[in-house]
Amino acid sequence: MAKVSSVQKNLKRSKLFNKLKLKRQALKSKIYDKNLSLEERFNLVLKLSKLPRNSSSTRIRNRCAETGRPRGYYRKFKLCRNIIRELAGSGIIPGLRKSSW
């Protein structure tokens, strides 16, 4: 099990990201707009840098929904490899079974 504080910190980051997602996208699209003057674009970069760091998507860590484990994460199931192995072995995940050849 991951530390509860790590999981909560990650949840807080993801909520902040979702809250400021549109604002961040709008600023980035204006920054890359070549029709604006260099000075205007520079001011937009300053506005973007004033947004909280945790509102960036790169600060969010994918974690297992069951255990909170950050490594060995499978996006399709939103679980770590250990839990997938347990659930697949007991037949809880439909359509997933251990391969054999």
From Swiss-Prot:
rRNA-binding recorded as keyword: yes
Matches recorded under InterPro entries: Ribosomal_uS14, Ribosomal_uS14_bac/plastid, Ribosomal_uS14_CS
Entry GO CC: cytoplasm; small ribosomal subunit
GO terms (BP aspect): translation
GO molecular function: rRNA binding; structural constituent of ribosome
Annotated S-S bridges: none
UniProt keyword annotations, A-Z: Ribonucleoprotein, Ribosomal protein, RNA-binding, rRNA-binding
Pfam families listed in its UniProt record: Ribosomal_S14
Database matches in SUPFAM superfamilies: Glucocorticoid receptor-like (DNA-binding domain)
Entry's family note: Belongs to the universal ribosomal protein uS14 family.
HAMAP family for this protein: Ribosomal_uS14_1
Chain's role: Binds 16S rRNA, required for the assembly of 30S particles and may also be responsible for determining the conformation of the 16S rRNA at the A site.
Assembly and binders: Part of the 30S ribosomal subunit. Contacts proteins S3 and S10.
Protein name: Small ribosomal subunit protein uS14
Organism expressing this protein natively: Orientia tsutsugamushi (strain Ikeda)
